[in-house]
């Protein structure tokens, strides 16, 4: 998970320590409903995790921690979910211009996050040796739910307009339209200044 270090400060991870997998999934679902960018990806990710949360509730996941052999795989699953939360939360708090520039990289991180969470879930289930037809069916349904993450079409249009401007189209108009939606109460110059300041912070972190 080291490649995700630039998603947030370690203090953000520390704040999530102590929450079990079901509670972490609830946080992700809540955060996904308020994101500004990658809305479709965030909500697909959250919907997939809701399937997992339902299965974990059936397993009484908080009780599984009592067993020594379950602690490490559960901790790995929870760690992957914490990073998943930071990924979703970054689509709310980060600079619009930064997220736009990193569009396909963020898409890749959603794919990686889902893959890692599913792998750790599978490990937890293998260790429990659950012989229950309903749970097996739920797991198969989760595995079939392979979400297609992609760069939102509207955001891609803005990125294309800025990086490869059409002589017939003024990129400023495209950007102005988008920023007016993100900052409905601010004049364009102030909104652009706010995004520029956020972008500077992101570049310093990178």
Over which residues does each language-model region extend?
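Alpha-helical bundle protein-protein interaction modules that mediate dimerization/oligomerization
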Residues: 71-204
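N-terminal amphipathic alpha-helical segments
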Residues: 1-66, 99-102, 112, 120-142, ...
